[in-house]
Amino acid sequence: MSAGPQSDFDGKAFAAQLSTAPGVYRMYAGDDTLLYVGKAGALRKRVGSYFNGTPKNARLTSMLSQVARMDVTVTRSEAEALLLENQLIKSLSPRYNVSLRDDKSYPYVLLTREHWPRIALHRGPRAVQGRYFGPYTGVTGVRETLSLMHKLFKLRSCEDSVFRNRSRPCLQYQIGRCSGPCVDLVAAPDYAESVRRATMFLEGKSDQLGEEIMQSMQQASEALEFERAARLRDLLSSLRSMQNRQYVDGRAADLDVLACATQSSQACVLLLSFRDGRNLGTRSFFPKTNGEDSADEILGAFVSQYYAEHSPPREILLDREIPETELIEAALSTAAEHKVALKWNVRGERAGYLLLATRNAQLTLVTELTSQSAQHARSEALREMLGLAEPVKRVECFDISHTMGEATVASCVVFDASGPVRGQYRRFNISGITPGDDYAAMRQAIERRFRRAVEENGVLPDVLLIDGGAGQLAQAQAALADLGVENVWLVGVAKGEERRAGHEALIMADGRELRPGAASPALQFIQQVRDEAHRFAITGHRGRRQKARMTSKLEDIPGIGPRRRASLLKHFGGLVGLKAAGEAEIARVEGVNAALAARIYANLHGLALPDAAGESSP
């Protein structure tokens, strides 16, 4: 008999309250790992199909058994859902999309970042440095765009190998679709201006570009440069006839769309963002309220606080008027150094954006309230299992991660009765211990976290979970005793038989062991917190280890001091960009000659290092 989904997530109930509109759905595991992103022509029907009957294959069964929650984003059409799905898959890399989807990638328009940039169709990994515009739903749209770009701005399309070896202009120049930079038929400043205009067009700023061209045409006419004025007139005519404002092609201007939904003293603010003409998807926030705040007050406070830390676009759409609009506009404009407009009475396409955001805010809030109810039940079960008199308001969990003692990192995650409090997560880079000594690492992390709490009279957890057995728990006990910390309930979470989930042993500070079993809501809560601490520790460890290894590679290269190392990293935007560069690109960095570039390239790719004479070392 096939096994159905084993998580506590009620997929049928979730699907039943969804809209029949098109959209994108996201499946998450208990530790917030993104499992899958999919699109739907009708969300209720598509999501419900996963939970009606037996999964079609073992991989789908495995995926569904891990689902702890789902999020959805409503769109206006299935085409929009398709594009948003692709963007989320590319940016978030869900675990199961790699195998469950066709790996064919959508096409983009690529504008390279070179002295003489080229424009071309691109599929696959973004290995080439430059800007990528899209995605497009098909190759036809890209080719039409490229044809227009060559006609309007005369940018080159040839590969570098062809560009570097030409002695006379190609056919593209002869038919007026390239300005001939390969043989110096266009000045560098003029070509750069064409690139700037092309970028504006691809960013969806065709109105602004049209105004610029109109002004240039008038100036040329006044200067009696009639031939140039005629060229600009033709350019403006072609631009206006080919302007495309289709939502699915990402031609929307840069803007944010905000909607606020409230229910049962809870609030959800949903942010829908567009940047460079691309729909970046939605993000949900759940601000804490006093239960009496109105939706417009909540939204107004959110706008002020959120954009104090994030650069605002020029236009922000709101689903309602907020208090002190003019004051907030002035403050945002001053901070951003450009005009910021807050709008709520809008029509046409922008009204559609507001409707999308409003529907998604309402749906997200309903989902959150359902999730919070389950979380409260698990928290209450934990209180009962531990025999605590008061509700469990705060739980912290520590975990250690390293690779054979290298780059040891400790994590501390925080949960309250409503779930994770990610803003209070902490990582500790462990040092000064014997590599691989988990006991010493745990003690150092506990001491650092609670010493600060003691010195600053900070908040303490009701329950402190330690990922480990009696030895780890003893280190935590000793550290708290040395600091004089009391009234914190300590629990060690030891792995069960064969490390199977649901078989964990809970070790109390007095030595007692509890084995509540897989069906226990209290253990499920502990597993959720422990798994989140594990994920957070591993992520920090991997980042620290990678940084140490890559940085040491640069430090080991003769001729690379701190200044050159900083120049290289700044030029390529980090180690990943540097590793993707070729020798010729590396040699363009100030202070790096061809020989040094060759040594850098060889070192980063594990090749034999050339010596000073240009010969490879053994």
From Swiss-Prot:
Subcellular location: Cytoplasm
Any GO BP: nucleotide-excision repair
Keywords: Cytoplasm, DNA damage, DNA excision, DNA repair, Excision nuclease, SOS response
Annotated ranges, domain GIY-YIG: 20-98
One Pfam family from the record: UvrC_RNaseH
Lineage: superkingdom: Bacteria
Recorded coiled-coil stretches: none
Boundaries of every UVR domain copy: 207-242
Transmembrane segments: none
GO molecular function, one term: DNA binding
GO CC entries: cytoplasm; excinuclease repair complex
PANTHER family in the record: UVRABC SYSTEM PROTEIN C, UVRC/OXIDOREDUCTASE
Annotated NCBIfam families: uvrC
HAMAP family in alphabetical order: UvrC
Protein name: UvrABC system protein C
This protein's encoding gene: uvrC
